[in-house]
Amino acid sequence: MKQSINSLLGYTIKGTDGEIGKVEEFFFDDQTSTIRYVVIKTGGWFSEKKVLISPEAFQKLDCESKKLSVNLTQEKIKNSPDIETDKPVSEQQEELIRGYYSWPGYYGNGMYGHMGLGMWGYPLVEVRETEKEMIQRKTEKQANKNPHLRSTQEVTGYDIHTTDGNIGKVEDFIIDNVSWKIHFLIVETGNWFSGKKVIISPRWIKDVKWQEQIVTINHSKEEVKNSPEYDSSQPINDSYEHSLNDYYKK
């Protein structure tokens, strides 16, 4: 089922022996457009802190009661490694937390051993790096952060550029709540298209300038403007998704 990230904020996380806390934000992998962690703000049953939980621990999502059940106890969460979620999560921290919960690594061969085309404008593994890319990668490695783990909260508000100009800002994300992959970005167009909201797929992203907070897609303003109308009050079904893909000839 397709669901927006914003609709999941505030959901109660229910452990095997009681409530753990509330959903605050999500971290996604910008190479595969997959949710890697949900950030949970714990409740009053122990000193308040924020923790990361992987979809590996998810058991049941109940949209009626707005609860997400996980296969973890309160005690397990309480004793989890401390992670400063307001700072970039390092690879070492990921290894620590995944080891603590016995979650497998991702990307197939270890965390980063999977070849292919990334969703956000570059290959999964830089086979041929430019000098600038090499310097950036080494700098990020020295800073100990995972350069491909992004916060949905951080990316919300990024400018969306087409091949011929700006069309709006990222407002939300549409995910599949089974695979936990991001299928679409919701774009608030403001005055560009008379306030119309449009959705774009990560597959259409040509380039991302993270420092400038700009996402560029490989379609024109006119193409986006005339795309099948998106109704935010209705869930995205297969019929709409097919019509959208047919329109963009993807």
Give, region by region, the residue ranges found by the protein language model.
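Peripheral interaction segments used for macromolecular assembly
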Residues: 1-250
